[in-house]
Amino acid sequence: MFKKLWNFYKIPLLISLTLAIVLISIKVEKQVLGITLIVLGSLIGTFFLDLDYFIWAFFLEPASDFSKTLAGYTRHADFMNIVNHIYYHKNDLREKTLNSVFFQIVLAGMSVIVVSSTHFNLIKAFVLSIFANSIYRMFECYFEGRADEWFWALKNKPKRSGVILYGAVLIVVLIFSVKLF
């Protein structure tokens, strides 16, 4: 199970830890509590996008086989089988809410607003980590040839150059948000 978790989360964790190091460096944080809050926010943000499977199972399609199985594992607190079930069926779900262009646009706006308005480093690191991992997941879908899954809500799917331009804009927003930190 740990090998599956490591294979699934090694790049998102690397992104989150890199982001935490950058945020600590930019903030020039010297207190242990501040460093801990930034690292904790970044690490928690790594796993946020996977709530999509639970949203799907409990709210969007509770009658599907995937949902019934996941709900059963969740009711019995069988974490090993929850991880296995999500790992083996991660590409079976279409039209995810958190892994989509609309949530990503909202997240881009939220990252700028949260970073510029609050002084609580845990929340700032949390939102920026979600945003950075969202960009990674979008490019992962793009390079696997599943970009239509990311842009499922749009009537006209963007072409290759449109996806790359959109990704570049998101990276610029992320850099701007990190700079505001």
What name fits each language-model region?
Residues 1-181:
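N-terminal membrane-targeting hydrophobic helices
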